[in-house]
Regions:
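Amphipathic alpha-helical "stem/stalk" segments
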Residues: 1-106
Length: 106
């Protein structure tokens, strides 16, 4: 559902689609799950390499699809740390991609 909302955002340029009742729960669940995994990775409870071996691509795709709404929420809440663990995890996924698959693009 996150990707469907993102596709509609790209078509219309209207970022309120992420807060539409039809998508909001799924968007929130997805970004919260990645933020929680990011916290587990950051604290060494989940291996970074093990996680990224399996999930690097979906992590990057999800970050790219949700970055606009995360940034909007950071601004509206005046809280730059909102979903920071997800952002760091996505940054790690990008580094992983560049190292393991230099010619790949998400």
């Amino acid at each position: 559902m996150l990707f469907e909302a993102y596709r509609k955002y790209k078509e219309t340029g209207n970022d309120s689609i992420f807060d539409d009742e039809f998508y909001k729960e799924y968007v929130n669940r997805t970004i919260s799950d990645f933020n929680e995994v990011g916290a587990l990775v950051k604290n060494g409870l989940v291996s970074t390499n093990l996680f990224l071996d399996v999930y690097w691509n979906i992590t990057l795709r999800s970050w790219n699809a949700s970055r606009i709404i995360i940034q909007k929420r950071r601004t509206s809440r005046n809280y730059n740390e909102y979903m920071i663990n997800f952002e760091v995890l996505a940054s790690d996924a990008e580094k992983y991609e560049n190292k393991r698959f230099p010619s790949s693009s998400v």
